[in-house]
C-alpha cells in the first residue's frame, strides 16, 4: 500500500501518522515547510511541488495545471491512498477522477457544520457548545465529500481560537491515523471507502 501525505506547514499531522506506524511512501508540499524536513529525517521521499511555478498565491494561480502536475507525481509512484494533512491548496480537475474515493482530508469541525477555512472561528462566533474533527473523502466541492469518521470536542467557556484549535488538533492526531489505517486495510483488500466504513463518532 503506497500512501502519499500532502502537507503545507509544521507537519504535526504527518508526525502523528508516522508515530502511529503508518508507512508513508511520499510526502508532497506546495511550499517549503517543516513537513518536508520531517519526511527527509524519516527517509521518506519528499517532493516540493511549489505553487510559484503555477502562479503562486495570486489570482492567476492555475489550479487545474497544479492539480494535474500533482496527479502525475502520484501516478508515477503508483500511489494507492492520499492523505491531505494541513495541505493549503484546494485541488481541482482530473485528480478527483483518477483518485476517486482515495483522497482523505481532515477538517476541524463536525461537517457538514462549519466548512471552509475558518471553521474554528465560525464555531466560536456561532456560540456552538460542541465542535470536533472530521475525516472525509475529498471531492471537487470543498469539505463536501462523504464523511468517514468524526470525533467531538467540547467548546469550553473562555476558549479562544488558538486554545480550541489546539484541542481539536490533539483529537485529530489520534483520529486521522486510525482512520488512515482502517481505510488502507479496506483498499488493500480491494474494497472501497464508501460502503465499507461506517461514519461515526469516535474518541
Where are each of the predicted segments found?
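One-carbon transfer enzymes
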Residues: 1-203
Amino acid at each position: 500500500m503506497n500512501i502519499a501525505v500532502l502537507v503545507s506547514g509544521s507537519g504535526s499531522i504527518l508526525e502523528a501518522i508516522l508515530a502511529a506506524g503508518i508507512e508513508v511512501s511520499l510526502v508532497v508540499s506546495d511550499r517549503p515547510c517543516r513537513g518536508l524536513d520531517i519526511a527527509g529525517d524519516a527517509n521518506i521521499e519528499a517532493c516540493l511541488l511549489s505553487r510559484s511555478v503555477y502562479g503562486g498565491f495570486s489570482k492567476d494561480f492555475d489550479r487545474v495545471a497544479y492539480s494535474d502536475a500533482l496527479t502525475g507525481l502520484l501516478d508515477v509512484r503508483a500511489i494507492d491512498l492520499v492523505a491531505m494533512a494541513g495541505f493549503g491548496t484546494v485541488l481541482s480537475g482530473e485528480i478527483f477522477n483518477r483518485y476517486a474515493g482515495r483522497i482523505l482530508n481532515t477538517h476541524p469541525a463536525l461537517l457538514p457544520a462549519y466548512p471552509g477555512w475558518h471553521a474554528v472561528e465560525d464555531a466560536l462566533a456561532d456560540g456552538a457548545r460542541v465542535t470536533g474533527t472530521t475525516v472525509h473523502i475529498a471531492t471537487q466541492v470543498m469539505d463536501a465529500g462523504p464523511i468517514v469518521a468524526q470525533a467531538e470536542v467540547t467548546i469550553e467557556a473562555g476558549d479562544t481560537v488558538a486554545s480550541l484549535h489546539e484541542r481539536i488538533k490533539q483529537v485529530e492526531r489520534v483520529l486521522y491515523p486510525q482512520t488512515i489505517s482502517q481505510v488502507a486495510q479496506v483498499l488493500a483488500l480491494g474494497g472501497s471507502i464508501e460502503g465499507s466504513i461506517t461514519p461515526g463518532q469516535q474518541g
